[in-house]
């Protein structure tokens, strides 16, 4: 789906497909099997209907089309995920402190492409993490940075502080 997305500006992710895959993998790496199975169903359904969910997401981000869905869980998920991202940006200012300005818009538009069932399962994962005092964003970035050779976000942040 991603390769078919037409953008008005060049996309670094489209030029570096491995970066796109790493970021998508990071995003999904902390979600339950229930969420992933439901989302796979969303992707298969969209493909059968001739829809490209990524095209729809980016069209929403550019405000080219009206909202795809209204579901209170979208706002709830975005609020909780944003809280986690804010915590990370304060904790790791050199590696995660900047560039998150569009996070809420990006996530909201992404979630609009999910089915109600996938949103329900995703919210369940986020709620469980909150009760367990876990930060899913931190878990995602830990996995990503470990993939590229760092032992932790803290190590990445220390290295970035030497550059800044």
Name the predicted role of every residue range.
Residues 1-3, 7, 62-91:
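Extended non-catalytic interaction/regulatory regions in multidomain proteins
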Residues 7-31, 39-42, 102-107, 111:
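A cross-kingdom feature marking solvent-exposed beta-strand/loop segments within repeated
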Residues 11, 18, 52-55, 60, ...:
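Low-complexity, charged, repeat-rich alpha-helical/coil interaction segments
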Residues 13-16, 24, 46, 72-73, ...:
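N-terminal low-complexity, charged segments
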Residues 28-44, 73, 77, 111-126:
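Short, structured motif recognition centered on aromatic/hydrophobic residues
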Residues 36-71, 126-160:
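Repeat-associated, polar segments at repeat-unit boundaries in modular proteins
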Residues 80-164:
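Long, low-complexity acidic/proline-rich regions
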């Amino acid at each position: 789906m991603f390769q078919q997305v037409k953008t008005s500006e060049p996309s670094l992710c489209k030029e570096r497909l491995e970066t796109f895959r790493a970021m998508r993998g990071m995003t999904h790496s902390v979600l339950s099997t229930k969420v992933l199975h439901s989302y796979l169903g969303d992707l298969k359904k969209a493909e059968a209907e001739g829809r490209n969910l990524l095209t729809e997401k980016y069209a929403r981000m550019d405000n080219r089309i009206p909202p795809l869905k209204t579901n209170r869980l979208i706002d709830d998920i975005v609020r909780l995920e944003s809280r986690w991202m804010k915590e990370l940006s304060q904790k790791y200012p050199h590696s995660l402190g900047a560039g998150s300005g569009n996070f809420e818009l990006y996530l909201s538009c992404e979630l609009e492409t999910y089915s109600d069932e996938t949103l329900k399962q995703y919210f369940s994962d986020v709620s469980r993490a909150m009760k367990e005092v876990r930060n899913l964003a931190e878990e995602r970035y830990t996995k990503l940075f470990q993939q590229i050779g760092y032992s932790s976000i803290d190590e990445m942040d220390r290295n970035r502080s030497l550059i800044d």
